[in-house]
């Protein structure tokens, strides 16, 4: 039996998604909880491996098991054994052709900036604080230069292990909600640190240091050293993963918190 789950987690206390020796990871905590419910060892496979400090509201995983449980039992049992900063949002039985990573057609992230001169006391690990005034409209204009299938070398981590820097960026929208700026970005896949590196460069535009056209120049330059600094991890959320409609996977609000699905 193969089960797919949607997972929400606060990544502030974890050294990323992937199980690693001697450090806390989201994968390890989820596998421990599911192992208790299944009464057998469980290994999960995820749609996207998030880095240390990065959060998820729409991470999708799958696992195989010989244990027969109702879907409600998988959800409630896992949540009863998970830390409070990790939760299962839905569960669905799928056939063996489904793979959380390889069946996915797109991933969607949101980066949340608290744009205020003073730092926040609440949500300190859930948003990235930037004190200088940012122009969200200019950031949105700049982001449109990245749409389509492009070589994202200028926005990929130096030690990225992906074989190709080419990705298809389908959607990028920057909006302001009071003191919060939201960068909403969707692509078929992402190279390492791609969202955070794009965010760092959009911030340069937002504070008036660079013009929107600079982003187009960066994309064409294919040189990471020319782009902005990598934005902090705490503002980043994996909010959704797309799959072919034939899988009929449940849908939940993207979030985080007050943000809608637009």
Curated annotation (Swiss-Prot):
The active site is at 51 (nucleophile). Belongs to the tRNA pseudouridine synthase TruA family. Its EC number is 5.4.99.12. It comes from the Bacteria. It catalyses: uridine(38/39/40) in tRNA = pseudouridine(38/39/40) in tRNA. The lineage of its organism: Bacteria, Pseudomonadati, Pseudomonadota, Gammaproteobacteria, Vibrionales. Keywords: Isomerase, tRNA processing. Homodimer. Substrate binds at residue 109. The keyword Isomerase applies. GO terms for molecular function: RNA binding; tRNA pseudouridine(38-40) synthase activity. GO terms for biological process: tRNA pseudouridine synthesis. Formation of pseudouridine at positions 38, 39 and 40 in the anticodon stem and loop of transfer RNAs. This is tRNA pseudouridine synthase A. The gene is truA. It is an enzyme of class 5 (isomerase).
